[in-house]
Amino acid sequence: MRGSPLIRLLATSFLCLLSMVCAQLCRTPCTCPWTPPQCPQGVPLVLDGCGCCKVCARRLTESCEHLHVCEPSQGLVCQPGAGPGGHGAVCLLDEDDGDCEVNGRRYLDGETFKPNCRVLCRCDDGGFTCLPLCSEDVTLPSWDCPRPKRIQVPGKCCPEWVCDQGVTPAIQRSAAQGHQLSALVTPASADAPWPNWSTAWGPCSTTCGLGIATRVSNQNRFCQLEIQRRLCLPRPCLAARSHSSWNSAF
């Protein structure tokens, strides 16, 4: 086939040039200092680009080259021409990596996980979204409960709704298994004014970009409890896919 000898010649020349460059960068035989370098806290030791000596991994936006490699556990790669003014190489996030990190644990793109018993989350393109598993986060309390509140029941993951009458006496009973509270209240008069009541806004459904936060409130024209939603924006999403680390959320 025409052009094949030229292609083979170019490929051979490229391999020879590459081997010469690698020979200049990597010392032969491999010799390393007796004591490994002292890295800053949280920075691991990794093998250099020659696979010879251990060096401190370079972190996000730090300069990098053949011998000083980026931290692979954080999905960082050395990007040439990404330094100031388009010169030099720096460590940036790998755009092809859709994994996410939550509470120090890494999950694959599309993997589902439970950071706690109350939510089910899914790793999605470098971020993650979560759905509530407790019915109290979705189901409203009874309509005849003027001041509902949620209490944490010993031995149970999900809190439960109870009616708080305030100054009005309420009948409470304690279950034998633990101090579970349930209140029986007298229905309020139809002419009595219903006080405004609402829970705090819940966390945003996303870690970056637009999401939805919910709360339970009776602040509407019918003065009835309903689930209200509003848009939320925790932070803008990075142009490159990144690892989401939400260590304080759960």
From Swiss-Prot:
It is found in: Secreted. Residues 98-164 form the VWFC domain. Residues 1-23 form the signal peptide. Residues 194-238 form the TSP type-1 domain. It holds the Pfam family IGFBP. SMART domains: IB, TSP1, VWC. One of its GO terms (molecular function) is integrin binding. Residues 24-103 form the IGFBP N-terminal domain. One of its GO terms (biological process) is positive regulation of cell differentiation. Keywords: Cell adhesion, Disulfide bond, Glycoprotein, Secreted, Signal. Belongs to the CCN family. This is CCN family member 5. It comes from Rattus norvegicus. The lineage of its organism: Eukaryota, Metazoa, Chordata, Craniata, Vertebrata.
